[in-house]
């Protein structure tokens, strides 16, 4: 049976993404000075104000005001007439120390306390910073090993920001959203783009027809592949007819409210934990990255066309309480064999994940817009395919 599936993305100027980028910029600043920083920073942005709060244990000193303003200005909120700008907005900060009760379990895992875990170094004794379940996914329907709807949505959002910032379309403002609907055939292969939707903030003196014509030429045509188009493809641009007031002055933004945009566009479940503002001892972040790393290597090794893994943790314990896989009927070998190989090859302890992916670095602001997965950036170590040969041995 044919089916339609839709995913969305947002630009870096979307209020929730402004909040995510501020939280991750603060995290980066702390990790740069003190890689052992424990950070959980939340941000709220609304008309004329940014509020930063959270729990932090660090030896670093960072200028919160300066980081917040610079991040907002870099995104493009540079003029007071936007209702929110980095020069004039108020910045409030309320940050306090991490709970010592949580630190007890993170600093030294339950297994280490009970003598079950003999680790080479302090990092490998780290326990999970919280309970929860994390999902990783990969599919061979795109070269990035990501679902096509979310990848096209991200690429449209990135292009929308690019043509705004480089002056190609000077009437655009920072806020924007994209959405792509893909038709899949009976074999679950993407065959065509059914609908492209772009909503973008703009200057008041430009018409909707001018916006649509410009976006088709400079954003949609360069991104949507010719082989996925037909004369039935629908293009929707600013369906309300007007989008002048946008950004935090129109919608309050909060850290962690775009978790589906951040991951797989709704193609698979999500454990619920957000990423931004959290240091890698928080398995909400590090275990999600590691689960993606495992899934991508499994699919790239040819063990399955689609692969999902769920990992779950208990606070203060190093080893996961469960690991589950699903190949959606696409496995090229026995699923039990795949799971056994994964558990032998990959170490799911938080400290081991941090070491393997080199996560104690100031790399996180780059993750905070346009997806944490599917981008081949040097800092995104979880996108590496360095375990493919090891996994191929089980075929």
From Swiss-Prot:
What are the binding positions for K(+) in this chain?
42
Q: Does the keyword Transferase apply?
A: yes
Catalytic activities: L-methionine + ATP + H2O = S-adenosyl-L-methionine + phosphate + diphosphate
Cofactor comment in the record?
Binds 2 divalent ions per subunit. Binds 1 potassium ion per subunit.
A biological process term (GO) from this entry: one-carbon metabolic process
Q: Subcellular location, in the record's words? A: Cytoplasm
Write out the residues that bind Mg(2+). 16
Q: Which residues bind ATP?
A: 14, 175-177, 242-243, 251, 257-258, 274, 278
What's a Gene Ontology MF term here? methionine adenosyltransferase activity
Q: Which InterPro entries match?
A: ADOMET_SYNTHASE_CS (IPR022631), S-AdoMet_synt_C (IPR022630), S-AdoMet_synt_central (IPR022629), S-AdoMet_synt_N (IPR022628), S-AdoMet_synthetase (IPR002133), S-AdoMet_synthetase_sfam (IPR022636)
User: Which of this chain's residues are annotated to bind L-methionine?
Assistant: 55, 98, 251, 282
Which controlled-vocabulary keywords does the entry list? ATP-binding, Cytoplasm, Magnesium, Metal-binding, Nucleotide-binding, One-carbon metabolism, Potassium, Transferase
Q: Does the keyword Zinc-finger apply?
A: no
* Region described as Flexible loop: 98-108
Q: What is this protein called?
A: S-adenosylmethionine synthase
Q: Specify the species.
A: Thermosipho africanus (strain TCF52B)
């Amino acid at each position: 049976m044919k089916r339609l599936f839709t995913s969305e993305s947002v630009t870096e100027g979307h209020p929730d993404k402004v909040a995510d980028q501020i939280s991750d910029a603060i995290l980066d600043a702390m990790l740069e000075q003190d890689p052992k920083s424990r950070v959980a920073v939340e941000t709220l942005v609304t008309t004329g104000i940014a509020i930063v709060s959270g729990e932090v244990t660090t030896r670093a000193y960072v200028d919160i005001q300066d980081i917040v303003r610079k991040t907002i200005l870099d995104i493009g909120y540079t003029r007071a007439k936007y209702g929110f700008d980095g020069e004039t907005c108020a910045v409030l900060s309320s940050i306090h120390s991490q709970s010592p009760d949580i630190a007890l379990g993170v600093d030294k895992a339950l297994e280490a306390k009970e003598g079950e875990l003999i680790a080479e170094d302090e990092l490998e004794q780290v326990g999970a910073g919280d309970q929860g379940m994390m999902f990783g996914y990969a599919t061979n329907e795109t070269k990035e090993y990501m679902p096509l709807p979310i990848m096209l949505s991200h690429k449209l959002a990135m292009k929308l920001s690019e043509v705004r910032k480089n002056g190609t379309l000077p009437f655009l403002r920072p806020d924007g959203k994209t959405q792509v609907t893909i038709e899949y055939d009976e074999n679950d292969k993407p065959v065509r783009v059914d609908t492209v939707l772009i909503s973008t903030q703009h200057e008041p003196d430009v018409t909707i027809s001018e916006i649509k014509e410009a976006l088709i030429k400079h954003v949609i045509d360069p991104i949507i592949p010719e082989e996925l188009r037909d004369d039935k493809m629908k293009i929707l641009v600013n369906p309300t007819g007007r989008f002048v007031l946008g950004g935090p002055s129109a919608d309050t933004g909060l850290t962690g409210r775009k978790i589906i945009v951040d991951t797989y566009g709704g193609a698979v479940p999500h454990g619920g934990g957000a990423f931004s503002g959290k240091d890698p001892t928080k398995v909400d972040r590090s275990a999600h990255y590691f689960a993606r790393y495992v899934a991508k290597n499994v699919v790239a090794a040819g063990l399955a066309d689609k692969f999902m893994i769920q990992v779950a943790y208990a606070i203060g314990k190093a080893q996961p309480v469960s690991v589950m896989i699903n190949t959606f009927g696409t496995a090229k070998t026995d699923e039990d064999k795949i799971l056994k190989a994964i558990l032998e090859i990959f170490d799911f302890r938080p400290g081991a994940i941090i070491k393997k992916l080199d996560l104690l670095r100031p790399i996180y602001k780059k993750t905070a817009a346009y997806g944490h997965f599917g981008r081949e950036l040097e800092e995104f170590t979880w996108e590496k395919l360095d375990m493919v040969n090891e996994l191929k041995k089980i075929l």
